[in-house]
């Protein structure tokens, strides 16, 4: 088995999907989890205005709507959380995503004050954060807020990780990578677009250039610039297609060096890091 085949198998990626079937699969997955653990009353998700959180948010709300109708349990809710750092450049996209999702509840937590306070505390301890590390601080502060909300609403935190993100480890460890349940896991980027199109999402929300937008020195830096490959390259690779050798090497290097992000904390029983 080639490394490409191993990666595809590990991430559960498929070369082709039926959008309607995958929508139903994700909704049923969320519903089944909530029904298995009836003490869970809410799904909590940060909404950025990008493709992934828009899709995950819509699926969460659909799952909650169906469960409420089927069970009569009106205590179930989907909580969409806006988590700007100061003023967000694409705020209108966030509002458009909220309008599309129609969440039960919307909360806004501006993380700038908390990030700056943490940065100052570290500075006083003799640690000056780089812009890159400050970006990770933002991602972790966002996740901290979501877990606080989930803790107070008997909820679980929903993630947006998918195959095209997992393969490169393009997420912050214990930031946006630290979630309870991931309904998009298995899909690549273009497949996520197919689901949103089938759901009637406004096109500008999934045709915009994806960006983590964590660095102050490089605001709205496109993911594809940071990664050195395009999402079309990544999707082709995940679909088992032949890609240029340099593209495959770049993708595989990302995968191998970020393996620790896709695993629990390393123990004495692990040996993947020795290979």
Swiss-Prot record:
Example GO molecular function: NAD+ synthase (glutamine-hydrolyzing) activity
Positions contributing to Mg(2+) binding: 52, 165
InterPro entries linked to this entry: NAD/GMP_synthase (IPR022310), NAD_synthase (IPR003694), NH(3)-dep_NAD(+)_synth (IPR022926), Rossmann-like_a/b/a_fold (IPR014729)
Example GO biological process: NAD biosynthetic process
Residues the record lists as binding ATP: 46-53, 160, 189, 211
Name of the top EC class for this enzyme: ligase
EC number: 6.3.1.5
Transmembrane regions listed in the UniProt entry: none
Protein name as it appears in the record: NH(3)-dependent NAD(+) synthetase
Organism the protein comes from: Escherichia coli O6:H1 (strain CFT073 / ATCC 700928 / UPEC)
Gene designation: nadE
């Amino acid at each position: 088995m080639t490394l490409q085949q191993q990666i595809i198998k590990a991430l559960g990626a498929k070369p082709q999907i039926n959008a309607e079937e995958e929508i139903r699969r994700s909704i049923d997955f969320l519903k089944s989890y909530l029904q298995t653990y009836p003490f869970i009353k809410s799904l909590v998700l940060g909404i950025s205005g990008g493709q992934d959180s828009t899709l995950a948010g819509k699926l969460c709300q659909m799952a909650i709507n169906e469960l409420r109708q089927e069970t009569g349990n009106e205590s179930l809710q989907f909580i969409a959380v806006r988590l700007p750092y100061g003023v967000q450049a694409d705020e209108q996209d966030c509002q458009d995503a909220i309008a599309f999702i129609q969440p039960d509840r919307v909360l806004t937590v501006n993380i700038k004050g908390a990030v700056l306070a943490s940065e100052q505390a570290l500075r006083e301890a003799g640690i000056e954060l780089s812009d890159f590390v400050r970006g990770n601080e933002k991602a972790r502060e966002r996740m901290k807020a979501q877990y606080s909300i989930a803790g107070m609403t008997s909820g679980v935190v929903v993630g947006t990780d998918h195959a095209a993100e997992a393969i490169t480890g393009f997420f912050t460890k214990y930031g946006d990578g630290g979630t309870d349940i991931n309904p998009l896991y298995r899909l690549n980027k273009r497949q996520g677009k197919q689901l949103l199109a089938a759901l009637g999402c406004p096109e500008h929300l999934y045709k915009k250039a994806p960006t983590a937008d964590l660095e102050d020195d490089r605001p709205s830096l496109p993911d594809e610039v940071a990664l050195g490959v395009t999402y079309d390259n990544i999707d082709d690779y995940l679909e088992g297609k032949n890609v240029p050798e340099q593209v495959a090497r770049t993708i595989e290097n990302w995968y191998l060096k970020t393996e620790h992000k896709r695993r629990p904390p390393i123990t004495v029983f692990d040996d993947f890091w020795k290979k």
